[in-house]
Amino acid sequence: MNQSEMCPRFEKAVDILSKRWVALIVFQLLNGSQRFSEIEAALPNLSGRVLSERLKELELEGVVKRDVIPETPVRIEYSLTDKGKALAPILGEISKWATEWIDPSFLD
């Protein structure tokens, strides 16, 4: 694959991951299937409206899968697809980089 073929794909990947909250949502789902309320509780600064939008976007991109479990009441769980799970090493490296290079005194 030459540079001109890779650039649009790379740009799309960065566009997806750089959207606010996306990387943190994916990172959270690396722990396994979760309900909306579990994701929301794990990311307390993320509003329910934005979480809902991001999950829909990630579902459209094929990164997240939404499973409806036919119980009473109906249960909905979100999990990563193979495409989403493939982000694990990337997010792991970002986590290592942050641990080494981000000064805790600059965090909110």
UniProtKB/Swiss-Prot annotation:
Residues 7-106 form the HTH hxlR-type domain. This is Uncharacterized HTH-type transcriptional regulator YvaP. GO terms for biological process: negative regulation of DNA-templated transcription; regulation of DNA-templated transcription. It holds the Pfam family HxlR. It comes from Bacillus subtilis (strain 168). It comes from the Bacteria. InterPro entries: HTH_HxlR (IPR002577), WH-like_DNA-bd_sf (IPR036388), WH_DNA-bd_sf (IPR036390). The gene is yvaP. Keywords: DNA-binding, Transcription, Transcription regulation. SUPFAM superfamilies: Winged helix' DNA-binding domain (SSF46785). Disulfide bonds: none annotated. GO terms for cellular component: protein-DNA complex. GO terms for molecular function: DNA-binding transcription factor activity; DNA-binding transcription repressor activity; transcription cis-regulatory region binding.
